[in-house]
UniProtKB/Swiss-Prot annotation:
GO molecular function per UniProt: microtubule binding
Residue segments, region Disordered: 915-950, 970-990
Protein name: Protein STU1
One of the GO BP terms on file: cell division
Gene: STU1
Amino acid sequence: MSDEFNGLDGLSDELLSAERKLDILTQFKAHVKKTLVNEQVCVKYFENLSRLLVERGSNRRRGNDGDDVVFALAHSALCYLIKRVAMQAQHKFQHDLIELIVSTLFSIPFADKKVWQSSVKALEAIYLAKPNEFCQVLNESIAYNGSIRTNVLLLIDELARMESSNGRNGSMFLQKFIPFWVQEMNTNDSISNTDIELIYDIVANRCPEPMVRSMVDSVIRESAAKVFKSRLVGKLNNHGSESDMKDDFDRSITHTNSINSQVFNLQNELQSIMHQAPQFPTVPAPEPISYSNLSYLIKDLESMLPAFEGSRETEQNWKIRQTNVTKLRSIVLGNVSIEFPDKFLELWKDLNLQYCVTKSALSLRTSLCTHGCSLVKDLCCVFNSMLDISIIENLWSCLAKLMSNTKKIANQNAFICLITLLSTVPFHSRLFNHCFALIRDKNNVSRLYSSTFLRILIVRFHKRLISQHHVYVEEWLQKGLTDAQTTIRESMRITFWYWFKVSPMSGKKMLNLFQPQIKRALENSIPTHLDINYEAAIPPQSKESSRRSSLLPKRFPSYAAPTQSSHLPRSSIKRSLTDLAQGTQSFSKRSLRTPPDHDMNIDLTSELTNSQTNPLLNRYMKREEVEPEPLHVILSKDPKLGLDLLQKYLLSDTKIGDEEKVQSAIVSLIRTNPKAFKPLLHLPKFYQLIPLNFSMVLLPLNDLDISMIETQFKTYDIINNVISILQSLEDKNSEWSIFYVRFKYQIYNFCFNTIAKMLNTVTLSDQLINELINACGKDMDAEKYYKLILNIYLADKTKFVRLLKSTSTASTKLKIANVIQKKDSEFKIKSILNYPSVPEPIVSPEEHHLLEMTMVNPLGKRTVSSNTVIHNSLEGLDESESNPNIIADEDNHSEKEDLVTVPPVAKNSVNTVSFVADSPSDSDNDDTKKNGSDVVDHEEIRDHEESHGFTKFGGFSKLTEMTKVHSVFQPETVDENVDPMEVDSPDESNLDQKSLLTDIFLKNQHQEGSVSPIFKPQELNNDPRHDYDSDMLSDAINGIEIKTNDGSVANRSEDDIKTLGTNMGSVSDPKTFKPINLAHFANDSLFSFELKFIDASIGIVNLTQLKLIVQSIINNGTFKMNELQYILKCFLCYDQEVLEWIHDQHELKDVWAITELLLSSSSSESQIPTNIAYKSIILTACLLTIDDELEHTVLKDSSISQLFEHIISLVAKLDTFENEIYFACTELRTLLLSQDNNKHLPSFLEKCLKALCDTKEQYIVKISFLLETINGIISSMGNLLSVDVLRDLAKTISRYTPSDVAEWRFASCTALATIYSQLISRSTPVGYIRSLMPLLDPSDFEVVRSLSTTKDATRRLG
C-alpha cells in the first residue's frame, strides 16, 4: 500500500506554513476515519504527530494562540489513528509505542474537557487491544514519570468506571494496580501527598470496604500512612460511624427530595397527595428475582421480547405479555438495582423494553394495563434518581396518552403512576414543561391532574421554581384559577396557597391582579395545615338596591361566561409546546437578571468553572489551562457574553481583575449599545465599577430615574455630574458627539427631572444655573425645561436674574425672560439687559461751544498710538489748558496708577526720568465720574492763530470730528516696537488693560536727542479761568518727583551687566541675585524678542506692587494683561528685593501656580485666548530658567508632566503652523528637552505615544508636533533607549510616512532617520532595521537612510 502522506514528515518541516500543515492534517484525518492506513508507516505517523503535539503544546503554555487550531487538529488525528490501528493492526502496539502515546497524550495541556475525554477514549482502545502491555506501561509511568503520574491515576479511575458500566467488576480491574501502588507508596519518595489521596479516593470509590482496609494496612511508610489516616478519619466524621455508612448510602438516593424539604414536610405532603388520589387496583407483588451473572439477565430479557413484536394484541399473546410484564417486575424488584444498575438501564434502552411497557399500559384489557402501570411504579420506586431523562420522557409519553383515555380506571392508573414518577425522579426542565403543557390540554382530566402535579413540584423543588421558572408557575396558576371547570378551579386554589407559602411576594401580586370574586374564593380555601399568615380584606358593602341590580343586564365573570371557550380564538387559549421556554418579556428578564425575593443563597461557582462528570477530575487533574480571556477582551469581542459574565461576577463575590481596562471596555460599549446594560442597572455593585456620569447617562436610556442610585451617592456628587453631562451634550469635537445626538432628548429630560427632585435639598451653583440657561432651545421637553427654570427663579430671584443678565446670547435671555414674565408680573425684562441708558451731562452755556466739534474717547477704549499719530512739541502750550490728574482706571474708579514711567529717550542713556504721583488723595480731584468710568474734563480753549496747520494745543486744524482729546502731560513713548497682538485688537484682554497716556505731541519728531520737554514763554492772561487752570497746573508740576532709574536689561550690554552685578554684589549682601540672562534663548527666538519688548516698555518695578498682583490673581482668579507683563518685567529687573522674592522657593511656587492656572484655562477652552496662552508660555519659560538656576529645584515632576500635557492640548487646537502659540510651544519644548536632567524625557515620550494612539480625528498640527517631539526625545536620550523601545517607536512612527500630509511625512522620516542613526551606531544590521519599518516603501526607506547620513533627501519627500 502506497503512502500518499509520506509518513507525515512534512509536519516536522519548520519552513512549512501553518496553513499547509492544516491541509495535511485535515486530509490525513479524513483518510484515517474512512479507510485503512498503511501499516508499514503507522509508527512513523505516531512519531510525527507526537512531535508536533509536544511542540504545539509548549507553545500553548506560553500563550501563543495561533497554534490552537493546529494543536486541536493534530490531537484529533492522533486519537483517530489510535482507534484505527487498534482495530486494524493490534500487533503494532508494542511497549515503546504505547509508552510514546501515553507520554504524549498526558504531556499536553488539558485546557478543554473534550481533549481529556478524547484522549481517554483513544487509550481505552489500546487497553482493549493490548491490556497487559498497556497496564505495564501505566505502572511504569507511575513509577518513573512523576509529571504525568496524576493523569495516569485518573485514567485508571476512568477505565475502572468503564469496566463497571460494561458489566464487569471494577474492583477486579483495580486489583492489577493496587499491589504496585502499595509498593511505590512504601518505597518511592517522589510520590506526592496529592497522588496518595487520589489513590485512596479511587480505591474507596470503586472497591469494597475490606479491600480498602487491606490497602491501608499494607502501607507502612509514615507519610503515606498519615495521609490515609487523615482521609479515613474525615470519612468517619462525615458519615458518623461505619455502621451508619449503608444507611447514608440509602439516604443519598433520596437526596434530591430532602434538599428542598425545608418549608414542607415532604413525606407527609406526598402521602397526603397519594391518599387523595384514586385508589390503585390491588395487584399482588411478584417474587423478586436475583442474578449473579449479567449474561443470565440478558438472556431472560431477550426472551421477553418476541411476545411484544406483533403489532396487534390477540387472545393468544396478551396473556404471554402479562406474564412477561410480571417477570420484568420481578427482575426490577430483585438485585439488579444493586449489582447491575447502570447495565440494566442500558439494556432497558438497547432492548427497547420501553416498547413492552407502552404496549402493556395502553392495552384495552384492564388486567394487562394495570400490570403495565404497576411495572412503571416499581421502576420509579426502585431506580428513582438513576433514571435518565430519555427513559423518563418515554414513560411520560406513554402515561400521558393513557391519562387522556376515556376509561376511568385507565386514566386513574396513569395519574397514580405519574404521581409516583414526579415524587421520585429528580428535577428536569423538560419534565416540568410536559407538566405545564397539561394545563392547556383540551381534556378536562389532564387539566385537573396538572394542578396536583404542580403541587408536587412546588413541594419538592420550590427553590428551583422560584429562581428559574416562577413566570411559568404564575401563568400555570392563572390559567387553572380561571378555568371554566369548577373542579379544576377548586383543585388549583389549594395549589395556589402552596405557592403562596414559598413565594409570598408572587402570591400577593397575583391576588391583586385577580377579580374580586376569584380573590374571595381563594381566601375561603386556605389550607389550615400550611399555617399561612394572610388576612382577607373585608369588601365594602354594596349600597345598590336589589331591584336595581336585578334590572341590570346579567354579567358573568371571565371564567364562567356562557360559550366563552367556544368564542375565543384558539390562539388565545392554546399555547404551542415550542413556546414553553418563552414568557412575558418583563417577567423573563426579571427572572434572569435580578435575584428573587427570598433569602435563598445563589451559588454561581458552577457556572463560572468547567464542570466534569467525574468529581476526581476537578479535584486532581493538572489541567495546564491557557489563561482565560480577560473580561475586558470578552466585552470587546462578544458584548452579550461579556455582559452576562460581568453580571455573574457582580452577583457573586468574584473579584474583577484589570478594573481600569474593564471600565474602559464598558464605557466603549455604552457608546454603542447602552440599552444592553439594563439588567446590570439593578445591581448596586455595577455603579461602583464605572464613573457616576456614565451611570447617570444609562439610567434614562433604560427607562429608569435617579432613584436607582440616589441612596448610593451624595447629592453633591450627583449635581456635579449633572453639570458635567450638560457640558458634554453640546461638545461637537468629542467622540461621544454622535451618541449625544441620538439620545440628547432623553438625557436632557433626565437631568431636568434630577435637578427638580433635588431642588429643595441643595443650593444650586452658578455653574449649574448657567448650564441650564445655555441649554435653552436645545432638543428637549420644553415644558419640563421652562417649569424647572421657573422653579429655580422663584427659589432665588436675585441670583437667577444676575446670571441671566450675564448671559451673552440675547435670544436665550428673551426666551427665558418672556416665560418668567408670564408667571411673575414683577419681573421686568429691562432688568436683564446690558445696555443701561446714560444721562447726558449738564453743560453750561458758556462751555457748550467747546464740545461741538470734539469727541471724548474713554481711556479704556483707546488703542496704543501708532505711526499715524502726528506728534507736536509742547511749544506754545498754555499751562493752564491741561491737568495731569485725569489718569484713572477704567474698571475700578477707586484704583489709581501708582507709577507713570517715561522710557529712556536716548539709547545710550543709563538714567531715565520717572514721574511719580504724589499720592492718590492729592490727585483725586476729578468730580465728573459717571457710571464707573472717568470722563475727561472739557477745558475752555481760546482762539489762537494757526501756524503751519497746527494749533497751539498740538491739534491739527484739518482733523474732523473724530479728534481725540488727550492730556498734553502724558509721558513720551520713544520705542515704537508695538506688540502686534495688542495693537487695535478687538480681543477682550486689550480692552481690560490699564492704559497709560502715551500719545504725546512733539513738534520736531526727528529731534531724537531732546531729553526734556522745552517750554516756551507765554504772556499771562488776566482771565480768572486761566488763573484757576494755572494754579492747578502749578500744583501738579510741584507734585512731580524726578528720580533716576537703575536701567533695564535691554539697555545694557553683557559686559555692563556683569560689571554691574559685580559692583552690586560687592556693595550689598554677598548673596546677590541676577535677572534672567537672555542668552538662554536664541537671538532670533520669539521669547527673546518678547522679553526685550517688555523690558523696554515697562520701567522700574517694586516688590509691593508685585506682591499685590500675585496675591490678587491667586485670590480672585482674574488678571489683566498689563499685570502679566509686569510679572514678566520682574524677571528682567535688577531690583534685589524683587529678585530675592522671585528666587524664594515659596514665592516661586505661587507664581508657578498662576502659570498652571493660565495654561489650564487656555487648554480647556474650545477657542484659545491667544494673548493669555502666549504670555503664559513665556512666563513658563522664565520660571523654568529660574528653577534651573536654583540649588534645589522647586518644580515637581508632576508639575512638569502636567505642563507638557497643557502644551499638547494647546497645539491640538491649532489649525495652522503659522501661529505665535505654535512657535512659542516649540521653543518651550526645546527648553524642556535641553535641560541637564533627563529624568522627564521618558514621561514625555510616553505622553507623546499615548496622544498619538488617542487621536481619533487627524489633527495635522498636533501629530506633526508630537512626531517632532519624539524625534527630539530620541536625540536627547540616545543610548538610554533600548533596541526594543526603538523598534516599537519605529513601528508607531512609520504609520505616518505613507501619509498624504507633507508635514507628517517629513516629521516621521526625520524621526525614523534618528532611530536609524541610533541603531547603526550600535552595529545593528541594516536588514533588521528595515524589518522594523514594514510600512515603508523602498523609496521611503532610502529617504530615511539619506536623512540619517545628512544627505539631501528633500527631493524624495514630495
